[in-house]
């Protein structure tokens, strides 16, 4: 569906866009990059290496899938950030936005902690699956409403290690 070279090219483009934003808008202030675990770790690690600006790394865990292929609709925080974000610029880095529920939840949760700004980046965006209105500031690819794996995305813990993104068919 999306091969390794396309992913690398797009992640580098996003890194350049975020670098330009940081240099223009943030001046000498760091950007805290919050990786949403587990699925975003590959995208996150490649993205932060493509950014030539002052960034800080942190991690947050959130789940709305469990072992299913469709969101349960209930978002749970499974791991919190380790540093205060009050008065800071924050970017949530997510693997995929489908229903929008997770990003909406995280955005509201982090905004309540009084950062200067909360932004978001997502590798994949499924506009046809949206249940709440949410659009990331930076999007890698828009895709159809299919279940996908690879490049950090999994099915019941499997396939995260694929270097590409593949559509899963005939799940039973």
Q: Each predicted region: which residue ranges?
A:
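PRPP-associated nucleotide enzymes
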Residues: 1-172
């Amino acid at each position: 569906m999306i091969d390794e070279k396309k992913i690398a090219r797009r992640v580098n483009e996003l890194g350049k866009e975020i670098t330009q934003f940081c240099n223009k808008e943030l001046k000498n202030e760091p950007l805290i990059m919050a990786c949403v675990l587990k699925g975003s770790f590959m995208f996150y690690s490649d993205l932060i290496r493509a950014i030539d600006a002052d960034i800080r790394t942190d991690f947050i865990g959130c789940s709305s899938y469990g072992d299913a292929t469709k969101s349960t609709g209930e978002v749970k925080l499974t791991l919190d950030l380790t540093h205060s974000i009050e008065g800071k610029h924050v970017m949530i880095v997510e693997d995929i936005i489908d229903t929008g529920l997770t990003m909406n939840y995280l955005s509201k949760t982090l905004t309540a902690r009084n950062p200067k700004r909360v932004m978001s980046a997502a590798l994949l965006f499924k506009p046809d699956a949206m249940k709440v209105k949410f659009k990331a500031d930076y999007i890698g690819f828009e895709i159809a409403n299919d279940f996908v794996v690879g490049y950090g995305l999994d099915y019941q813990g499997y396939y995260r290690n694929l270097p590409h993104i593949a559509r899963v068919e005939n799940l039973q």
